[in-house]
Amino acid sequence: MSNKFLGTWKLTSSENFDEYMKALGVGLGTRSLGNLAGPTVIISKSGDVITIRTESGFKNTEISFKLGQEFEETTADNRKTKSTVTLAGGKLNQVQKWNGNETTIKRELVDGKMVVECSMASVVCTRIYEQV
């Protein structure tokens, strides 16, 4: 994994996040809180274990994983998923699977910013983070 992903990132823009959360099945109350949250994401690495910690006024979450190995994840909206993160073409690609559903979260670096594309069925959300 490129060390360029490592560090602290702050959300600066978000498009279609409410629609994405609806597609995930997130209720109105949780969506309202999620839309207000301006998360900070901290990506670190120790050996071959990558940790992504997301901190916000809504909820803090943390996942630690090895590339290509499935792990159990409890998401900020309390979904229990089987997740796998891979690296391809300079992008960190995360797939979450639960109850017959699947969503993808792709992270890539563009002009020094981390662009995160979240997809569920035909709904796509784009969130942009700047390094702090």
UniProtKB/Swiss-Prot annotation:
InterPro entries noted in UniProt: Calycin, Fatty_acid-bd, ILBP, Lipocln_cytosolic_FA-bd_dom
Disulfide bridge map: 118-125
Function text: May play a role in lipid transport protein in Schwann cells. May bind cholesterol.
Tissues where the protein occurs: Detected in spinal cord (at protein level).
Residues recorded with modification N-acetylserine: 2
Primary localisation category: cytoplasm
UniProt keywords, alphabetically: Acetylation, Cytoplasm, Disulfide bond, Lipid-binding, Transport
Sections of the chain in a coiled coil: none
Organism the protein comes from: Equus caballus (Horse)
Subunit structure: Monomer.
Family classification: Belongs to the calycin superfamily. Fatty-acid binding protein (FABP) family.
Domain notes: Forms a beta-barrel structure that accommodates hydrophobic ligands in its interior.
GO molecular function ontology, one term from the record: fatty acid binding
Compartments in which it is found: Cytoplasm
Binding site for (9Z)-octadecenoate: 107, 127-129
Name the UniProt record assigns to this protein: Myelin P2 protein
Note: P2 protein and myelin basic protein together constitute a major fraction of peripheral nervous system myelin protein.
GO biological process: fatty acid transport
GO cellular component term, pick one: nucleus
Binding site residues for hexadecanoate: 107, 127-129
